[in-house]
Amino acid sequence: MSSQNSFMSSKKDDKGKNIQVVVRCRPFNQLERKASSHSVLECESQRKEVCVRTGEVNDKLGKKTYTFDMVFGPAAKQIDVYRSVVCPILDEVIMGYNCTIFAYGQTGTGKTFTMEGERSSDEEFTWEQDPLAGIIPRTLHQIFEKLSEIGTEFSVKVSLLEIYNEELFDLLSPSPDVGERLQMFDDPRNKRGVIIKGLEEISVHNKDEVYQILERGAAKRKTASTLMNAYSSRSHSVFSVTIHMKETTIDGEELVKIGKLNLVDLAGSENIGRSGAVDKRAREAGNINQSLLTLGRVITALVERAPHIPYRESKLTRILQDSLGGRTKTSIIATVSPASINLEETMSTLDYASRAKNIMNKPEVNQKLTKKALIKEYTEEIERLKRELATAREKNGVYLSNENYEQLQGKVLSQEEMITEYSEKIAAMEEEIKRIGELFADNKKELEECTTILQCKEKELEATQNNLQESKEQLAQEAFVVSAMETTEKKLHGTANKLLSTVRETTRDVSGLHEKLDRKRAVEQHNSQVHENFAEQINRRFSVIQQTVDEYSVKQQGMLDFYTNSIDDLLGASSSALSATATAVAKSFASVQETVSKQVSHSVEEILKQETLSSQAKDDLQKLMTAHRTGLEQALRTDLLPVVTAVLDLNSHLSHCLQSFLGVADKIDSHKEDMNSFFTEHSRSLHKLRLDSSSALSSIQSEYESLKEEIATAQSTHSEGVNNLISSLQNQLNLLAMETRQQFSGFLSKGGKLQESVGCLQQDLDLVSSDAIECISSHHSKFTEQSQAVTVEIRQLAGSNMSTLEESSKQCEKLTNSINTICQESQQWCESAGQKMDSLLEEQVCYLHSSKKQIQTLHKDVEDGCGSSVVEITDRVNVQCQAQEKALTSLVEQVKDDKEMLGEQRLELNEQVQSGLNKVHVYLKEELRNDVPTGTTPQRRDYVYPSLLIKTKPRDVLLEQFRQQQQEYLESICSVISEAVEPPVEQDSLEDEPPVAVNDSVISEKSCIDLSMTCQEKGGVPFFQQKKALRKEKENRGNATLLERSKIMDEVEQSLPKSKLPLRMQN
């Protein structure tokens, strides 16, 4: 394909060259701005495109794009147009080519400005330097510069022709009368060229003369003011520049090279309604538009390669004949307006320019003339002019008046035009005849070929008819077999419908079962998913509770450590205070000792006197004390020690129970996922157990409180008795009082420990029971057996705890009874000892009265000496009490805070347990999905369907039946035909139409064959369609007769010779 394109392009280059088309758009003028017109043109100089917006302003789709050789926008300058368009053409003119540049477009778009230009208003520029100068002055200026640079001999001749109202005028004529019309003739040397008789050619020697010539021609040219342009050109102008250049060959021969440049400024097309032209201006506009319309038709004919080009319809096109499709290099400058009010004229101009781009010229270099040939031509021209001059002087030739001469010349011109037109028509007719002859020969060959093909086709038709006859017989047999198969097929179709209905029912039932299984599967999947989620949540919840319990145990351990440290600090402070008090007391006793030592010596004598009396009393009192001690020891050993051991055993047993409860709690934690059914019963039983335990412990606490009160009363009574005894027996009874106080403090400490152990036991029981209740209430298990086992174990532990509490209460009762007996015995002993001591006291009264004064004086001295020390000790004790009170207050506050924190922790655990219970309820009541019956599951039933299929008879049996039916139908039809025979036809009618009778016999013979075939075909028709088949046979028989007659007529027509008329006559 590429080689073919290259070949075509090379062939195109050999044939010629397209006309160069340039588009120039001028800026907006004042009239367009006043009319508020917008721009409809977009000039792309780089892409050489002009885009016209044919729709509204915002319509992006209504655009049309044209592509040209060059495009100049409104900002383009005169020098830019000249350098791009004219400079290359000027070089070709100097090379010897004929070139043409003409401006085309609407009036007022800048054609004259482009070709001629204007003079600047300040007149400080020369023609060649003026930025407003057009193509014509710049071209002549550059011609002289280039020819001067080359250095050859040259001559330049210019002419300026005006075409006004289809008349030719010479604008450079020396006569002042511009109205002299010029005549135009065909150039005999150039078939496409013209000669204008009387056109003045002026030789130009320098550029200054050129500018004078241009000014003179512009002054004579027809211009007028219209609404479109104040200086509108009313005529076409053709400025021709002919250059003769001298060349010398290698051999020394002198040649003359001729180049010609035509610069054409066309008058603009205009809308008379818009331009406001009337009368004379309207006629001018009509002639201008007529010539431009002819130019457009010439361009269209050249583009479409029409056989006739209407050059002679206008003088403008006759002058431009060689430039349009001839041997001249042509460039067209199309000037347009960007305003929307001139859109129609702009589109028309661009369409003409786009079509003109396709015109093909064949530029040729002008033949170079030798000096001798040119001199010979000039000599012949001089001789011809001399003869015409001599004839005019001598009046020997033919003399005609001007009117006759002009009339004769007009006839000659019209005849020449007619001859030209007729010659063109003759040439066209000859080409048409030649084309028709070739077409006739081709048709004749095709006819011969068709005849041979027709003969072959007739032979093939005969063979095909024979084959058709055989095929009909086979078709009849096959039709009978097919009809039998159709009946079998219908029966099978009914059976298949029954089977399909059964299959549909079974399929519907199976789909219902599958839907039931899908629903079951969906419920199971949902429950398994919910179960997994519930297990994960419960594990997560118990791990959180376990973590919380660990944190709380750590916090409680911290609280215990804090309490221990606080008590240790308090004990340390107390010990330090006691040590300080002891030192102060020692100092006071040291000061008192001095005073007492003075009286001791005096008292020794008196004590020695009383020693004898006290010794006897001492012995009696020692006897009583030993007896009382042994009694107390025996009572303590026999009564209190077993109770204490029993209480200790009870404490260990309760600790063991606590450990067992902890083990049970661990078991409950291990089986927390298996408890489900007996949640309420376990909660109630544990709650009852906790109440019983708390009531028992409260009873123990009350008994302990009563025991403590009794011990306190006993201690107070004993202390009173001891104080009474001390007053009489100071030194002897101090030891007894100390021992008794130690014993009672031991009892109280043991009782406090017992209370602490019982309180801890109660707290532990409360914690264990509450933990058990919370754990059991927050976790429902599915395995009831393990829950029952745990319940039995808890009940056993509860029973053991109850028995332990009963034993503890019994031991406490025993302890109370023993303590009461001891107190009674002590009271009796005290009474007996008091009676004995009364006697002794009476004896000592006298001595005491005597010693009283001494002791009082000593007492005063001791009081005076110990007053200061007592005050000091009191102050220290007060300070120590205040410090201990502060410490105890802070400890009490800390205990309250810890108690509140424990309450908050308990509430938090209760909330977590309650949330776990809620999740369990949600799991059991909401998340678990039940399989709800829908009522669409199919029931079991029996299906009824046919089990046997019908089979068609064998082919041999069917064919035998077909032959029998065919024989029967043939016999019946032959009998019907014999009965329906028509009467004999008259001889005259037979003699009148002999060929038709022959044809009828042939037709009847063929119809009999067709009838037999139809009978055979009818044999295969089912019995319920045989009547319809008979009616169709009659219709087919008539159709067959008509078809045979038409075939015979066609054969007769083919046998007759046909007249072969030429195609021209038929047309």
Swiss-Prot record:
It is found in: Cytoplasm; Cytoplasm, Cytoskeleton, Spindle pole. GO terms for cellular component: cytoplasm; mitotic spindle; nucleus; spindle microtubule; spindle pole. The modification Phosphothreonine is found at T937. Highly expressed in unfertilized eggs, especially in the germinal vesicle and in the radial yolk-poor channels. Also present in testis. Residues 18-359 form the Kinesin motor domain. Heterotetramer of two heavy and two light chains. Interacts with aurka. This is Kinesin-like protein KIF11-A. It comes from Xenopus laevis.
